[in-house]
Design a protein with these regions (language model features):
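Short beta-strand micro-motifs in enzyme catalytic cores
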Residues: 109, 241-243, 297
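Oxyanion-binding "anion nests"
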Residues: 226-231
Length: 334
């Protein structure tokens, strides 16, 4: 596979090399990236802002050169070349992975996806995905999405936890997809953001692929699609706001992009500027959070067979709850 090249932007200045690559190569796990670094498939060239020689020699025919270390600190203006092996086509099979199934019947299932789990197989993720877990735990799944996405009607980012509805047959899939398309499904998230955000704020900004970094989305892209996000509730904490966020559209990275665009990125979101900030007391839980503080907490849809409106709530997972519990003013908020 041809090498991918990334110029380190300002928001990643001072980051470890492996953490930077985890952020820009969203479809690859940290262990895969660390192996690529160890095998010499990653090169770092010192940027012009700091001067100095490249981190190592010119690219050779296969690996990019002598290995650098995963904990190498990169800086704004550095150039990182990555050569990842082409994905090997594999048959998708069920795997005995833990899966929190909140509800299921003959038509649908509702699951609580953990953070760190990719929804479906793709480049660098032939196993360990939600689809692999679904194939093990459920006997029937729709085939509309193709062999790699059975049952999948909508998605969550790898780093986002929370609720997803899964279709068990094609008729249910088509009806649920229609509801998402016609904006009849209600989706609400809980996110912790930097700064003070007021309830009632509406963010109406089209989203498209970022021209400078193809792994990112942008609210300033040339070819963009409508996207609307609303802050429905907000609880202020020192330097932070815990928000309840509703989305009317379902664009890739929508909440993360929109909140970053208004200057209030999600805590822990390295890709969109949510790291390297400090709060009162230098809260360690915030500093060590390695994924965006974003959780799909509420899902409301119409049952595809009998027309019932079905509402599901998923409480914050333990890693996010621990962050809240360590924040000044949270435990004594009442």
């Amino acid at each position: 596979m041809a090498p991918l090249t990334f110029d380190v932007p300002a928001e990643f200045d001072g980051q470890r090399l492996d953490r930077f690559l985890v952020s820009v190569l969203a479809e690859h796990s940290r262990s895969q990236i660390q192996k690529a670094i160890a095998d010499g498939h990653v090169a770092v060239e010192t940027g012009p802002r700091r001067g100095g020689p490249p981190a190592h020699g010119e690219r050779s025919g296969g690996p990019l050169g002598p290995p650098v270390k995963p904990n190498l600190i990169v800086h704004e203006g550095d150039r990182v070349d990555v050569e990842l092996p082409a994905p090997v086509a594999t048959e998708v099979s069920g795997e005995s992975l833990p899966l929190d199934i909140l509800y299921q019947d003959s038509d649908v299932a509702v699951v609580n996806k953990p953070a760190g789990m990719v929804v479906h197989p793709g480049a660098g993720h032939g196993s360990g995905t939600l689809v692999n877990a679904l194939l093990h735990h459920l006997t029937d799944l729709s085939g509309v999405g193709g062999e790699l996405r059975p049952g999948i009607v909508h998605r969550l980012d790898r780093g986002t936890s929370g609720l997803m509805v899964v279709a068990k047959h094609d008729a249910a899939h088509h009806e649920l997809a229609r509801q998402f398309h016609d904006r009849e499904v209600e989706k609400e998230y809980i996110g912790l953001v930097w700064g003070v955000v007021r309830a009632g704020r509406r963010i109406d900004a089209a989203i498209g692929r970022d021209r400078a970094n193809r792994q990112k989305m942008s609210a300033r892209a040339k070819h963009a699609r409508e996207a609307v996000t609303r802050i429905t509730r907000a609880h202020q904490l020192p330097g932070l706001t815990l928000c309840q966020v509703a989305i009317q559209t379902g664009r890739t990275h929508q909440i993360r992009v929109h909140l970053s665009a208004i200057g209030h990125p999600i805590v822990g979101d390295a890709l969109y500027g949510g790291v390297h900030r400090r709060v009162a007391g230098d809260i360690r839980a915030v500093q060590r959070l390695e994924r965006p503080f974003l959780h799909a907490a509420r899902l409301l849809f119409t049952h595809p067979r009998d027309g019932r409106r079905m509402e599901f709530i998923a409480r914050l997972p333990d890693d996010l709850q621990r962050v809240l519990d360590d924040l000044p003013g949270w435990k004594d908020r009442r």
